[in-house]
Structures are given as structure tokens and as C-alpha cells.
Amino acid sequence: MTQRPMKKRKLLLFPLLGLLALTSLFSCGEDRWKEYYPLTGRDLWMDSLMREVYLWYEDIPASKELNYFQDPEAFLKSILSSKDKNFSTVDTITDAPLPSYGFDYTLYKVATSDTTYNALVSYVALNSPAEDAGLERGDWIMLIDGDSITKKTEERLTDGGTRKLRIGKYVIVKNEESQEPAEGDADTETGESGDTDNDNNNNGNNNNDNDNDNGNNNNDNDNNDNNNNDEEEEEDEGIGVIQEIGDVTLPAVRSVTEKAVYEKRFILYPGYKIAYLAYNSFTAGTAENSEEYNDELRAFSRQCMQKGIDNFVLDLRYNAGGEMECVQLLADILVPADKLESPFAFLQYNDKQSAKNRDLILDSQLLQGGVNLNLSKIYIITSGTTAGAAEMLINCLKPYMTVILIGQSTKGEYVATETFINPKYPWAVRPVVCEVFNSEGEADYSTGFKPDISVNESSYLPYYLPLGSPYEILLNTALGVITGAIELPEPQAGTTAVKSFATKKNVRKGLIVK
């Protein structure tokens, strides 16, 4: 919800609010304003803005204690409150996403070497060079252009031209066929036919469907074995190894625009109709279509209604926040029908901006062609990346429905930021402007939400699979909870991550929940 008139008013306050800070620019009666302003103007603007809109403005040091000759990041850090856990940020203004290969990864040391690594692909952006190459979540990169991954060669994974990658898969080697973690027969369907997001993941998901068909008998047998021969199973855990499967050509880096709706899927078990949504950002749309992603949510809600969905798994493991209206829309889709029009959240600003304090409701008008699913329970997959708007959704749904969290603790960002831009400087400042409470006045999740069922997916590498696969460990856990048949495989030893890399996502404008 961009407050543009307010932004302009704040910029006009600069000459007055900056006067106190300018005393250091006069020496022995000599006016040195013109000499120093090009070096200090940007920091002075940031200082005046923060003293007006920052939620914790009272904690900003006195002007005489500040250095206005610093770069923007250093200056912002020097004025932030101790309550601000890197929620407020400043960054350059970019019209296009930074070029990248479009995948994230985590490094693991090779067992036989102290200096070489394998890279586990943890995320593949849609319509990216990585997806074009056929990379999938759960793939292992073993070589880059024929070279081992080392501290010197790792940079080739993040930037550059065309690369050749040696790919492997993590498998458990043992005498008996490996167990599949899912129980029962599961059929999966993608979302709306012709949907670009679904098509982009079809290769991996078709393989998963085949696994469903071919693995069920083995799975049932294994379950019986588990019930009758637990001790024998413990003795035959097997060894995890990475098996080479071939080379792929990775196209050169290019600008990659992240899609908010990553994967939509329907999973049908006997007696259960389950919807799965991997939602990676609370973003309404694109520059070309401002409601593109919201409309995808609305269309998916209609599909869920048509299929008679009675359980919903919302995957927010990669969702680091976004726009407040998107939170309201998704909540409108999920909550019990009789809760529509009820209070949803309360925004509390600082005392200088108290006129902006306001209530948000579960506004059915936001549905605009979407439908309410009248759910009483929601299963949400979380991680340490889950933050901001994603946490707001969790907090604000809790008064109205049962929220079951699966995965890891969330980040603990309980405030909202707003983007401010001064045309004179190519920088965007995003200070914390308000605190976000649910309808019961609760906002105490600064340490994050702890999961009801804690699962560290890196401890189950055989099941570190593309999002939407019913065998992927976190989704599989959710399915097990829903069907009452949860049974986790034993964690594998010796899988300690060394380093993780994530591509830089675009910064959104407007009121962002962090």
C-alpha cells in the first residue's frame, strides 16, 4: 500500500529537520554547505526521514554523534535501534533483476578431501538458466567445467557464461530396496492446465508420479517389515552416496524474475483431497500485470473448490515476506467462511505517525473472483527463511483456525517496512514503520514460530526433492500428519552443510511485512 503523498511530505521536511545536523558544516563563520552537501546530502536525508517515520526513532543517536560522510549501509547501521534485527535496509534502485543462473545451493565437503565440495541444489527459479539446463532441487553439482568445486572455483556457480556441470543424485546403497517415506496410494495432479508454473516443473513431477505408481507395493511391504522387524531394519540403514548421472550445459547468467506462485498441485489419497501450494513471495503481480500472482491465487482457489479439497498444505519455506494486501487475500481464501469481515490485524506506528494506525479485516471484496475454502485447519511448511508477511499470515490465522507448522522455526520478523525514495539519490531506504498485531493483540514472535513437527530437511537427503513431490520430506511429513500415517526415516549421519548461497531477490515497493 504505497503512501506516495506521505513520502513527498517527508521529503519536504528535510531542509528543516536537517538544520541541526548541519552545524558541523560551518567553521569559523565560513559557510561550507556547498562544498560538503554533495558528500553528506544523502545521509542527511536518511537521518531526517528516519527521525520522522522510524518505529523506534527515539533510539536514533543525537545528530552531533553521527558521521554523515559514510556510505549508506554504514550510516543506516549507525542509527538503527538495538530492537532492529536488520529489518530496516537500504539498497540501490535497480530497474531489472541482477543477472544470475537462477539457483541456490548448499556446499558439503567431499568425504575424501578437506578442500573440495559438492553443491546441493536447494532451489531452482522458474524461467531461469538453471531450469533451462534441467537442474532440479535435490541435484548435486560435482564438477564445474571439469574442475572440482573449491573456494577458488565456487564463484563460477554464481556468475559468468555458459558452464558444463557434472550432476549426481544422492542415493542410499544397501541390500534391500530403499524405503519410500510415503504410505498408501497417492495420485498427483498439477494445477490449471496450461499454467506456465506447472509446465516448468513437469519433468521432475512426472518422475515423481512414476515413483508413486511403481513404489507403492514396495512401500507397503516396507511398512509391514517396519512393524514386525524393527531391529533388522535398524541394522540395514545403508550408506548415502552421490552417484554421477551425467553432464548438463548451464546457459550464461541473465536477469531472472522470481515468480510468487511457484508450484500448485493436488494430491489425492483414499479419503483425502489435498491441495499443495508453494508460495514464495507475497507479491501481487508484475510491472506488466499488477494482479498476475493474485489472480493465480484466485484461480487456484476456484480449482480447489471444484475438486472438493478438504486439506491444504501451504509451503512457505522460501517465503521471506511481501505485500500486506496479498496476506489478506490468501487469508480470505483459507479461513472459515463465518470469519470473513472479522478483524485480521492491527498496524501500530510511532507516536508521530499515530494517525496511520489502522485495523485490517478479512475483506471478502479482495477475493474478486476467487473463493473462500472454508477451512478449519491449515498445514504450513516453514524454515528459517520464512519471514515477514509469511509470519504475519501465521500469526493472524491462529485466532481463527488450527495452524500446524512443519519444518524449522521461522525467522521472527514481526514488523512492517516501507520504501522511501529521494529522486536525487539512486538509493531506496526501507525503515521499519509499524508493528503488526493479530486480532487478539498478539505480536510476540521475535524469536520466530517454532514448528509443531520439527524436521530438518538436510537430515533426509534421499528425500530432498523438487517442491510438490509427495516424497519430498517436508511435504511427505505433512501428508503423513493429514492421513495419520506419519513415519519418518532415520536421519543420515555425516551430512553437515559448510556454506549456503541464495540469489538476491528483487526488492518490492510499498508496505512490506518483515
Predicted regions and their residues:
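Flexible, low-complexity junctional segments that flank or bridge functional domains
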Residues: G29-N311, T495-K514
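Bacterial N-terminal signal peptides that target proteins for export
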Residues: Q3-P15
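A general structural signal for short secondary-structure junctions and capping/turn motifs
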Residues: R4, I93-D95, E155-T158, I267-L268, ...
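C-terminal "post-core" interaction segments
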Residues: Y272, Y276-L277, S281-E292, R298-A299, ...
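C-terminal motif of bacterial Sec signal peptides marking the signal peptidase cleavage site
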Residues: S24-S27
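Secreted, disulfide-rich extracellular signaling modules
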Residues: F14, G18-L22, C396-P399
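Short intrinsically disordered, low-complexity coil segments enriched in acidic
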Residues: M1-T2, Y400
